[in-house]
């Protein structure tokens, strides 16, 4: 019998009160309902310098990058709420992805991304809901070998979208976001059953 899918959930924002932190919690709830074990983290707890090849050559991976990489390797799935900054992903998210991608010792290239399944959501006060950032995030993860499910949700008008308990006021949007979490869990389970 296969184990429950393990999914790592986080937002590409370190801002307190981030709409994307609220949104990824909803997606994580959907993954739990779909049978997954979900670990929620905050990138604020993993401060890292900007990726620098000279720094890596001289000092290796920063300690927080190593910790984050271990978490990636311990989970089969990712749920990411990716804010859009100037039409692309946030610097903190790109930096985390870059550090985690780095090889240590004799490990395989991109070991932390091997056989990963990911689901993407975004929240923004603007009309597009962070959609352009999702395109960029999907492209980067796909280039790293991650299977990003086709369903995604870009939440516009995020400033007024959440109730006092952190749920979405719009039940259709809530269902879409929880559905993405559940679909990541189901996809991992199906791949496990197929022997991948």
State the predicted function of each range:
Residues 2-6, 21, 147-196:
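Glycine-rich phosphate/pyrophosphate-binding loop and the adjoining helix
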Residues 12, 43, 123-124:
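Cofactor-binding loop segments of dinucleotide-utilizing enzymes, especially the Rossmann-like FAD-
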Residues 2-35:
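N-terminal beta1-alpha1 ligand-phosphate binding loop
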Residues 33-39, 146:
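A generic structural motif
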Residues 60-144:
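Helix-loop-strand module that forms the ligand-binding subsite of alpha/beta enzymes
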Residues 43-60, 161-165:
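N-terminal beta-loop-helix "entrance" segment that forms/cooperates
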């Amino acid at each position: 019998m296969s184990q429950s899918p393990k999914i790592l959930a986080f937002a590409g924002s370190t801002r307190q009160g981030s709409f994307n932190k609220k949104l990824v919690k909803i997606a994580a709830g959907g993954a739990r309902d779909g049978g997954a074990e979900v670990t929620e983290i905050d990138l604020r707890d993993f401060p890292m310098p900007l990726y620098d090849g000279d720094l890596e050559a001289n000092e290796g991976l920063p300690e927080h990058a190593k910790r984050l990489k271990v978490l990636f390797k311990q989970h089969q799935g990712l749920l990411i709420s990716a804010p859009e900054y100037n039409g692309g992903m946030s610097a903190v998210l790109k930096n985390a992805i870059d550090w985690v991608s780095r090889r240590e010792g004799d490990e395989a290239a991109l070991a932390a991304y091997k056989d990963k399944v990911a689901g993407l959501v975004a929240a923004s006060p603007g009309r597009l809901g962070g959609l352009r950032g999702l395109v960029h995030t999907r492209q980067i993860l796909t280039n790293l070998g991650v299977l990003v499910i086709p369903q995604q949700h870009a939440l516009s008008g995020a400033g007024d979208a959440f109730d006092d308990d952190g749920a979405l006021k719009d039940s259709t949007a809530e269902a879409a976001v929880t559905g993405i979490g559940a679909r990541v869990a189901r996809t991992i389970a199906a791949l496990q059953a197929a022997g991948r």
